[in-house]
Each structure stands twice: as structure tokens, then as C-alpha cells.
Amino acid sequence: MNYLILISFALLVITGVESARDAYIAKPHNCVYECFDAFSSYCNGVCTKNGAKSGYCQILGTYGNGCWCIALPDNVPIRIPGKCHRR
């Protein structure tokens, strides 16, 4: 049993674990990338440039009209609850 756990852990480490999430991509200061046209390719471009599979403009979403990304890598900042601190 211990060997099975050890081998499973070794395979996990060797192959690496990459995760992705669906979320609003964030600019610095916790602000979303704003969009106004649901049929525009702007959000898809922003999302794919940052490593996501795709993206679209979510009209009247939780944080207003913002870019929603599908399968965004963990190293890319996402919008978290709290204020957008624009300067």
C-alpha cells in the first residue's frame, strides 16, 4: 500500500500539476478589463494572450461589464472581492 502511494506521488511530481480556472482577469489594483460589446474579440484576445483557452465579454456580470476568461492559468491575477483601487 505504501508503495502505491509513493509511486502515485512520484508520478504526480514528475508530470506536474497544472490547474486553470474560469474568472474575471484583473488589471493591477484589482480592476477588471472592461468591455462593452459582447460580440467583440477584445476579451478573447486579452484572455488568450495571458494563457487562457478563450474569453468573452460578460455583460452586467458581478463586476459590471468585464472580460471573463476560460481556463486561465494560476499565475495570472484574477478579480477578487473587494474594491478596485484605480489611481
Curated annotation (Swiss-Prot):
Keyword Secreted in record: yes
Annotated LCN-type CS-alpha/beta domain residues: 21-85
Keyword terms, alphabetized: Antimicrobial, Disulfide bond, Ion channel impairing toxin, Neurotoxin, Secreted, Signal, Toxin, Voltage-gated sodium channel impairing toxin
Compartments it resides in: Secreted
Entry-linked SUPFAM superfamilies: Scorpion toxin-like
One CC-aspect GO term: extracellular region
Gene Ontology process terms (BP): defense response
Transmembrane parts of this sequence: none
Propeptide: 86-87
GO molecular function list: sodium channel inhibitor activity; toxin activity
Tissue: Expressed by the venom gland.
SS bond list: 31-84, 35-57, 43-67, 47-69
Note: Negative results: shows no effect on Nav1.2/SCN2A and Nav1.8/SCN10A. Shows a weak inhibition of inactivation on Nav1.3/SCN3A, Nav1.4/SCN4A, Nav1.5/SCN5A, and Nav1.7/SCN9A.
Sequence similarity: Belongs to the long (4 C-C) scorpion toxin superfamily. Sodium channel inhibitor family. Alpha subfamily.
Entry function: Alpha toxins bind voltage-independently at site-3 of sodium channels (Nav) and inhibit the inactivation of the activated channels, thereby blocking neuronal transmission. This toxin inhibits inactivation of Nav1.6/SCN8A (EC(50)=790 nM) and drosophila DmNav1 (EC(50)=280 nM). The toxin (1 uM) does not significantly shift the midpoint of activation at the two channels, but induces a significant depolarizing shift in the V(1/2) of inactivation of the channels. Has antimicrobial activity.
Comment block on domains: Has the structural arrangement of an alpha-helix connected to antiparallel beta-sheets by disulfide bonds (CS-alpha/beta).
Protein name: Sodium channel neurotoxin MeuNaTxalpha-5*
Species of provenance: Mesobuthus eupeus (Lesser Asian scorpion)
